[in-house]
Amino acid sequence: MSNSAAGRLNQTSHILNESIKNDDISLRRSQPSTTSLQALEHPFKVTVIGSGNWGTTIAKVVAENTALNPHLFVSRVDMWVFEEKIDGKNLTEIINEQHENVKYLPDIKLPENLVANPNLIDSVKGADILIFNIPHQFLPRIVSNLKNHVGPHVRAISCLKGFEVGKKGVQLLSSYVTDELGIQCGALSGANLAPEVAKEHWSETTVAYHIPKDFRGEGKDVDHKLLKALFHRPYFHVNVIEDVAGISIAGALKNVVALGCGFVEGLGWGNNAAAAIQRVGLGEIIKFGQMFFPESRVQTYYQESAGVADLITTCSGGRNVRVAKHMAKTGKSALDAEKELLNGQSAQGIITCKEVHEWLETCEMTHEFPLFEAVYQIVYNNVPMKNLPDMIEELECIAD
């Protein structure tokens, strides 16, 4: 190992140790059970914006909890659906009649209090909590349509994975929602493959929410206790923290790493290569967070479901791995592979690697993130996948 590489390793270890030592982690398992929450004078109305497989799955989780906790929530949960025809019939009609999203989450029975709504503005009418769960490239348009239809009392949770890159630089999607709509927005992310959660196989997730300065008081506003009551299920265990930046960064960048894992898997290089990609990827995720979002906590990447656990799960399967593997085996482009495999849904790593590249190029720092840059070059500039190890090694040497 070179002296510079050893120095970087020691520096990373020092950052991790200091972060864990100095952070107050007493909050980690402090949330009480939902039975300790007092009945609210005005129960919260919840709307889910998005109806893909993850959007529908989260809507199912939330609707189960609103029905079970009428002292906290209005039972009815609206789910905004981008209307489309299935065998000549509106998807919203099918969902509301059959209580099943036959296109994006087939064979999963949905709660009867979950109502599909094709009208975005109507779906958020009277809502106190918005849950955004759409492909992140559509967020600006959705937010633009919601302006003047969402009051300042509303709170939000983003389940989106990605960044907004613009005049303000690289921005968390939760921050984008806050800036554009004037409402406090947290995030949900974790080792959660939608089909497994929908089938009620046990898993964990992380919800991050920072209590705003205009907090109206317990029982009158959204806090950590209420969020746990909204999302926690016997099969879906929730930990609520404040590190919105940390879980958002991990949730976005893991998809880029997963593309790299899909490439080496498709090339038949085996588990050693996949482990190497994940090792480099985790380091770059942490480095990106510390460099551009210093408020993020290093311990989040190691201790939370939204961190290394999500990275492992995503790199073991999921959309991004499938698309990248298909690219490696067929020679097709990322967009063609996505179209063939995903039934109208998105592999978010394809867009995220471009956003990250554009930001790093602006900062003249692409060499600091060799895996992210290599994935971008393979996806957008048709660089041969077999060059991946050399690209990582070459850029690591430049960074030294």
Swiss-Prot record:
Reactions performed catalytically: sn-glycerol 3-phosphate + NAD(+) = dihydroxyacetone phosphate + NADH + H(+)
Chain positions recorded as NAD(+) binding sites: G50, S51, G52, N53, W54, G55, F138, K161, A194, R319, Q348
Molecular functions per Gene Ontology: glycerol-3-phosphate dehydrogenase (NAD+) activity; NAD binding; protein homodimerization activity
Residue pairs linked by disulfide bridges in the UniProt entry: none
Keyword Cytoplasm among record annotations: no
Pfam families: NAD_Gly3P_dh_C, NAD_Gly3P_dh_N
EC number(s) per entry: 1.1.1.8
Active site: K254
One Gene Ontology cellular component: cytosol
Record SUPFAM superfamilies: 6-phosphogluconate dehydrogenase C-terminal domain-like, NAD(P)-binding Rossmann-fold domains
Alphabetized UniProt keyword annotations: NAD, Oxidoreductase
Annotated binding of substrate, by residue: K161, R319, N320
Keyword Oxidoreductase attached: yes
PANTHER family referenced in this protein's UniProt entry, alphabetically: GLYCEROL-3-PHOSPHATE DEHYDROGENASE, GLYCEROL-3-PHOSPHATE DEHYDROGENASE [NAD(+)]-RELATED
Entry's family note: Belongs to the NAD-dependent glycerol-3-phosphate dehydrogenase family.
This protein's name: Glycerol-3-phosphate dehydrogenase [NAD(+)] 1
Biological source species: Candida glabrata (strain ATCC 2001 / BCRC 20586 / JCM 3761 / NBRC 0622 / NRRL Y-65 / CBS 138) (Yeast)
Organism classification: Eukaryota, Fungi, Dikarya, Ascomycota, Saccharomycotina
